[in-house]
A protein has these predicted regions:
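Intrinsically disordered, low-complexity protein-interaction/activation regions
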Residues: 1-199
Length: 199
């Protein structure tokens, strides 16, 4: 049962189990998983989930739809789970649900950890700092939560991660400058200034 799971939000949302991409279903079902990944290992109330996913939308049985999406995600994430059992990933916890994942299984969490490690190394070991920050930046496959760019629940998390991405690039540039690589950085710095003129 199970296997190694990777949850990727630094680009289009996807989940990889033992090297194979998991079919996460319809957009709203994927949106539910994306929402839960913004704060994993925390109980989300059903009311908070419904408000986040559906907002003020009228005309649907949102409680029933949520149950259908939870069921669909459970099947997708744990296909070997016995019927009518909860499994170990998407758990029912009063007053709602909890996504139980190892933090390092989420690319955004790994990214944050690597950025902190890289920044801490800049002054003492700029070579190692550049390497670690490069590893962090390599986790990005597009814009954070790319397929949910227009959904209200994702906006603050997208902004937070994109800001951290820019900080990581700046920190890697600082490390590379300390390594004496100023010539190699000219085109990258010009591109950064064009993309972020107010930074």
């Amino acid at each position: 049962m199970g296997g190694r799971m990777e949850y990727r939000v630094l680009g289009k949302l996807d989940v990889v189990r033992d090297g194979d991409e998991v079919d996460l279903g319809a957009h709203r079902q994927r949106s539910l998983l994306g929402l839960l990944l913004t704060n994993p290992n925390t109980v989300w109330s059903t009311d908070r989930i419904i408000d986040s996913i559906w907002g003020d939308e009228i005309g649907s049985d949102r409680q029933n739809a949520l149950w259908v999406y939870i069921s669909g995600l459970r099947k997708a994430l744990e296909p070997d789970r016995e019927k009518r059992t909860e499994g170990t990933i998407l758990l029912t916890r009063s007053p709602g649900y909890l996504l139980n994942v190892e933090p390092d299984a989420i690319d955004a969490v790994r990214f944050e950890r690597l950025v902190a490690e890289g920044k801490a190394l800049i002054d003492s070991d700029p070579d190692a700092a550049s390497l670690v920050l490069g590893e962090a930046l390599a986790l990005w496959r597009g814009r954070a939560y790319e397929d949910f760019a227009y959904e209200a629940w994702a906006q603050s998390e997208i902004a937070r991660l994109e800001e951290m991405r820019l900080e990581a690039v700046e920190a890697r540039v600082d490390a590379d400058l300390l390594r004496g690589m100023s010539r190699e950085l000219v085109s990258e710095l010009e591109s950064l200034v064009r993309e972020h003129p107010l930074q």
